[in-house]
């Protein structure tokens, strides 16, 4: 079972001490009943956990992370496709990170314990939820939920109630900056006049006039009582029959004041207008008491200097309150700030999407290009290693993983069976295994049942275990502590650090230090993107094979290398060369503008049937993918974005002037039509004879 309704904080088979955790050997029977120790963190225990996590991260040799999200793709065509260029892959990752929410964040520091000759791991499972914490926030956060992802989470018993009700909220750095600016604008520089008005309020309604006169009379009586030692009673009677409004004498920072209760915001504005007009030594303040409860008061000041001091005190109080509100709203981002400030090696598994989510949720809006993203993320997290790349690139580990996939669970089972099943392996590859213990709240365990896969905290633990085992096979000698002093700078890891897959399924490997990308899939590297035409909104009865046949009849049997479906409404056509791309686009346009029989008889007529078929070069595909909109069908997406058919490459994409070539392309289109007609006449003549 993946999760219990009540999470065990301690395992009965684990012993502990108040000063240091001790690992003890337990019986096989006892260990068989031990649940995996995992620190679950919600709003209720976040602050105390964060304080403990600071010391754990500071002492860690590396930190493994993993995220659980509400979805991956906002439309079927936004999945990672075979013909996606590296910049398009980034745009699809960007779209995913911007539209879906993170609901769990796993953080697992790993520290080498020379005394026990083992790694000690500290798995934390944070529930996060983008709750609106600040009253002056923009409209509440919105995010998509992909049905397959939600079903996947439910299958593994994800606790949605805990996530929504107890999940830790957060502000990104950009949101924090904007919140600070909004607070300053909202409260003004003096921080006193809560109404924010600088002009005198004009009283039009009779009720306002009567209320102002009544307030002037009551305030004058109270002020006279203070000045002349008269009857400044501690509590005034109710303002009117049936009203809950009351005024009571209190003290505000050693100054006599009136506490106002039950007044509406409009009435307070009217009262404030009365004070400014008739009472120079009375000041209205909206403040907070020690319990952070707001209150409205009118304060008496005995001099101009005292009034200035009161205004300064109110301003400072509001500033402190604003800082507390924002600091509280930052929430889980403090964990991200901790990881960034400590500059530890961050370990993930197939983690480019995870890193994009980290940036989008906790730093700011994702940059428009992969190059800009790489430059920015590297300044926050200079050392990142992807265990999936480590397993695929290293020859020895790759040979090992040929027996199974490189998914997280498969890699964990293959490389760390002694950890997953708490048993010894006869596999010679694993004879020199790395021992890993788990410690939660000073309780250390070395035996447990397998935890809940696809729970972020446990997945982060598995990721760290895979990395530790891989390092062992790379030749790390953990007994020599000097090799761990600067884990990220170790030469054995140099070729793997800061190299991530630029997608969640397949694609290029991008170097976070340089921004350069190299295709790791031979099929991607075998063609040129300038040879691709994107066709959409053709008749649904046509499939890839039929489209290829139509084009080959018009341009020759060897003109098209392959046709690949984006979805049912669009295809990529890979031509033999780029000249054929522009020949096709020019011919399409000429056929569409013709009303003669050629447009009906031509082989391309099957593709153009209906008059709504669109076609453009690969740059149009990039433009469509860059849109924030996500229609289900690609043809609808192209129409929504407003991409039109193109017969010539964009000026910014040209590498040389094509003015003469454009004329040539047009002539070629005419030649193709003439050739088609001539061929048809010959065929008909031969048939008639």
From Swiss-Prot:
Residues that span the membrane, as ranges: none
Named cofactor requirement(s): a divalent metal cation
Enzyme class: hydrolase
Xref: InterPro entries: CAF1_poly(A)_ribonucleases (IPR051181), RNase_CAF1 (IPR006941), RNaseH-like_sf (IPR012337), RNaseH_sf (IPR036397)
UniProt: a divalent metal cation binding residues: 66, 68, 354, 459
Disulfide bonds: none
Alphabetic keyword roster: Cytoplasm, Exonuclease, Hydrolase, Metal-binding, mRNA processing, Nuclease, Nucleus, Plant defense, RNA-binding
GO terms (BP aspect): defense response; mRNA processing; response to abscisic acid; response to osmotic stress; response to salicylic acid; response to salt stress
GO cellular component: mitochondrion; nucleus
Main localisation: nucleus
GO molecular function: cation binding; metal ion binding; poly(A)-specific ribonuclease activity; RNA binding
The EC number(s) this enzyme carries: 3.1.13.4
Reaction catalyzed: Exonucleolytic cleavage of poly(A) to 5'-AMP
Biological function: 3'-exoribonuclease that has a preference for poly(A) tails of mRNAs, thereby efficiently degrading poly(A) tails. Exonucleolytic degradation of the poly(A) tail is often the first step in the decay of eukaryotic mRNAs. Essential for early development, possibly by participating in silencing certain maternal mRNAs translationally. May have a pivotal role in stress response.
Family under the similarity heading: Belongs to the CAF1 family.
PANTHER family: POLY A -SPECIFIC RIBONUCLEASE/TARGET OF EGR1, MEMBER 1 (PTHR15092), POLY(A)-SPECIFIC RIBONUCLEASE PNLDC1 (PTHR15092:SF22)
Protein name according to UniProt: Poly(A)-specific ribonuclease PARN
Origin species: Arabidopsis thaliana
Phylogenetic classification of the source organism: Eukaryota, Viridiplantae, Streptophyta, Embryophyta, Tracheophyta
